[in-house]
């Protein structure tokens, strides 16, 4: 079979999976970025539309059937445990450092702030709004691909096309709680990290308290609603 790589060494399959994840995610986010940059579409809309397309394609390709787990040697190769603690946190720290550096120490990062805050003013100052917007989506695609690769390494048991559904809302909630503004141009990496810790702690607390999993979505929705409302109020006051 054309997609049968069982004869390929494990290391080769791991590297191939990483390349495929990053390439596919970058291609799809680039498409969303193009529509956002070219037609001034709201990034939330283009991203959600993209997500539906991807989910449909994956469901069609797998026929909605669950697939088996990966070899036990692969998780130990990518995210081995040290004294019982998973080293996936080291990958997360590496991603934080890299994104922080891009955001704060490069011209592209400074242009991101400018375009997010006021695209018209950024264009007048000579910044290519199209290139910066597309670049932001490409960078997101690379991170998505890398994250999906790590998540596959964590997978225990069978998986399905629906795996990970709803996580995008958790990511949005964590960012909003961390001070990222929906109006653009406001936010720091440190704030996102704090937001992730707060939202994760809240989720685990609800689980420990025995709150029904379905009701946890209600709490997540309320958090997003309140955080965005406060963000909008700050924006209106600034105006």
Pin down the residues of each PLM region.
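Hydrophobic alpha-helical transmembrane segments
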Residues: 15-23, 45-48, 89-94, 134-138, ...
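Alpha-helical transmembrane segments within multi-pass membrane transporters and channels
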Residues: 3-51, 194-195
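Helix-loop-helix "hairpin" substructures at the membrane interface of multi-pass membrane proteins
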Residues: 13-20, 27-32, 83-159
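Hydrophobic core segments of alpha-helical transmembrane domains in multi-pass membrane transport
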Residues: 22-25, 51-59, 91-102, 137-148, ...
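Cytosolic-side transmembrane-helix boundaries in multi-pass membrane proteins
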Residues: 124-131, 154, 202-239
């Amino acid at each position: 079979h054309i997609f049968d790589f069982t004869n390929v060494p494990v290391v080769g399959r791991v590297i191939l999976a990483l390349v495929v994840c990053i390439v596919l995610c970058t291609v799809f986010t680039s498409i969303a970025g193009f529509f956002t940059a070219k037609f001034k579409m709201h990034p939330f809309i283009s991203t959600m539309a993209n997500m539906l397309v991807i989910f449909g394609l994956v469901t069609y390709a797998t026929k909605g059937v669950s697939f088996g787990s990966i070899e036990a040697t692969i998780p130990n190769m990518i995210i081995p445990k040290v004294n019982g603690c998973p080293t996936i946190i080291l990958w997360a720290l590496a991603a934080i450092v890299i994104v922080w550096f891009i955001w704060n120490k490069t011209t592209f990062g400074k242009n991101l702030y400018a375009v997010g805050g006021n695209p018209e003013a950024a264009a007048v100052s000579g910044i290519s709004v199209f290139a910066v917007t597309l670049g932001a989506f490409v960078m997101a695609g690379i991170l998505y691909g890398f994250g999906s690769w790590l998540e596959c390494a964590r997978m225990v048991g069978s998986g399905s096309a629906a795996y990970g559904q709803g996580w995008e809302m958790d990511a949005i909630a964590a960012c909003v709680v961390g001070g990222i503004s929906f109006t653009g141009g406001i936010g720091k990496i440190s704030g996102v990290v704090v937001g992730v810790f707060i939202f994760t702690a809240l989720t685990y607390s609800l689980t420990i308290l025995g709150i029904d999993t379905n009701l946890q979505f209600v709490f997540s929705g309320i958090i997003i609603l309140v955080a965005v409302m406060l963000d909008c109020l700050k924006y209106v006051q600034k105006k």
